[in-house]
Swiss-Prot record:
This is Protein Ves. It comes from Escherichia fergusonii (strain ATCC 35469 / DSM 13698 / CCUG 18766 / IAM 14443 / JCM 21226 / LMG 7866 / NBRC 102419 / NCTC 12128 / CDC 0568-73). It holds the Pfam family HutD. Belongs to the Ves family. The gene is ves.
Length: 191
């Protein structure tokens, strides 16, 4: 289990200057040839997303103005807060900020031939399934994971196991991304 606070994470500027990324975790750890990766991105200006051939992306707008995403050959979609949207990393995708507002989003990328991410927003206590990787990010409220208390802009990632996330207040929201391995793959096989 790895815990994080995005306010204390290193920032990497995008090559096109349109935003910045804070990498949360990847599997296998510390490699460019990952099977899955989670990050938080701040988008400051209109521009193209980087292409990631062989990957599926799920993007969830966390804060800021809506973002219109356009792929000339495939889709036109407006990202709204806390509504995950999946698309192929192979596509050229242009991002247009609504009213020029800076936006922050959660990104999970998975290698198409080995695993898949399911992203959802939780508002009550829940337990994850065993033997799957996952990432949680606190949007609001106070949550407990094991003996650790997590608050806004904090989270955790893991590569397997069963975990209970307990909401300690009457209201709260948490982004949860579960990683499911495709048949023939498991965390033990790809490290």
């Amino acid at each position: 289990m790895e815990y994080f606070d995005i306010r204390k994470m290193p920032v990497n500027l995008w090559r096109n200057g349109a935003g910045e990324t804070r990498e949360i975790c990847c599997f296998p750890p510390a490699t460019r040839d990952f099977h899955w990766r989670a990050s938080i991105a701040s988008i400051a200006t209109n521009g193209e997303f980087a292409r990631f051939p062989g990957m599926e992306r799920v993007v969830t707008l966390l804060e800021g103005g809506e973002i219109h995403l356009e792929s000339t050959d495939s889709f036109s979609h407006t990202l709204k807060q806390l509504q995950p949207f999946a698309f192929s990393g192979e596509q050229i995708v242009k991002a247009q900020l609504n009213e020029g507002q800076m936006s922050m989003d959660f990104n999970i990328m998975t290698r198409c031939n080995s695993c898949k991410a399911k992203v959802r927003i939780a508002d009550r206590t829940f337990t994850t399934f065993g033997s799957r990787g996952g990432v949680v990010f606190v949007i609001s409220g106070i949550w407990q994971l094991g003996d650790k208390v997590l608050t806004t802009d904090q989270g955790a990632c893991w590569y397997d196991g069963k975990h209970t996330l307990r909401l300690l207040q009457s209201t709260g929201k948490l982004l949860f991304s579960e990683i499911n391995w495709l048949p023939g793959y498991s965390p033990d096989q790809v490290q």
